């Protein structure tokens, strides 16, 4: 059984001390000619146990990582400090669609880093404007507003929608609403978690913004519930949004939605839902905002996930994650001029947004998606992936695996712990997958998101499928799960 984080912390000082002593002794014994070696070669690299213990002792505990340490990666593969190889089936939450350390993107980064990294938007720089032209042309919008993180992009879209509502729709000042759906995830800032229905995002963090989210408590009542079922606006249920807009559409600035819910467990709405959303938003003069941060840029087999429905073109889209290929934080908000120009100079911005380094990286990241046909790759690989895992579920209806869902290479499997003869959980299955050479992580306890880099090869995908199939059987027979110290909660 792997030692707990607490036990690892107690071992850390002695291990580091031994490493330092060995390094010092080696340096003293080395010939004089070796003193010109790179400094990095003289440093003793921490092993995985030391890294985990050190992070546990010195970093905030706002994540509960799988007990694996990543040291380097290439394409769909990553390695730990001990040299163990893994197939990455999380892709940093779909940030490395182009694969780890794609050579073209790394080259763009290093070349630009020797020229100019940051100018701020106080001045023009030579890399941002060509990037802006490229992304707006590619996705069919007039303008882009650059930011750094996905949450920043969403916050920017919310501000933009409210400003539009006051300037163009003439909603009374202070009254503009933003509607969302139940189980949404758009980030973790106060503004964004104000819209959340996830207790872990809200408890202990209030008070929250008013007039945002899927709940209409200020106008709903037991006698006249809005929506009609008396709860939050449900994802994929167009009647809920229709009822809400009938009641508050006149003061609603925007409806914000994920084309596929990611953190909720890769929830795909009924086909036609987004087209119906668009129609309702147009009817009530409400902006349709699509959060494509996790789903966009080829992940689902289309450049934008909303494009799986013909004719769907949101008023505003947000992008992030794979916009830089996982190399540098870059995000963006896209809209047409009528909306984008509602924000005037000085009203919104970011020191790093639109910086030349980020623009160079993002521009190359987009080119890689197009040149390597990653949309087609995601579509082909995803269909095969789901078909093979669905066959496992169909062949064993009483087994742990109860559902396979997704689009492209954004997929999830649903695990029913109550069907496990040994009471095994999705977390324990992920520990076993890790021990067998594949990395994935549960969301909402019983769902495992499976989203490898889009550059994964046929052989690697075959290996990933085999590992998952075998682990689903082995988890029910093995007496002890490797690395399971019972610390996860």
Residue ranges and their predicted role:
Residues 9-12, 34-489:
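Conserved N-terminal phosphate-binding loop of PLP-dependent enzymes in the Aspartate aminotransferase
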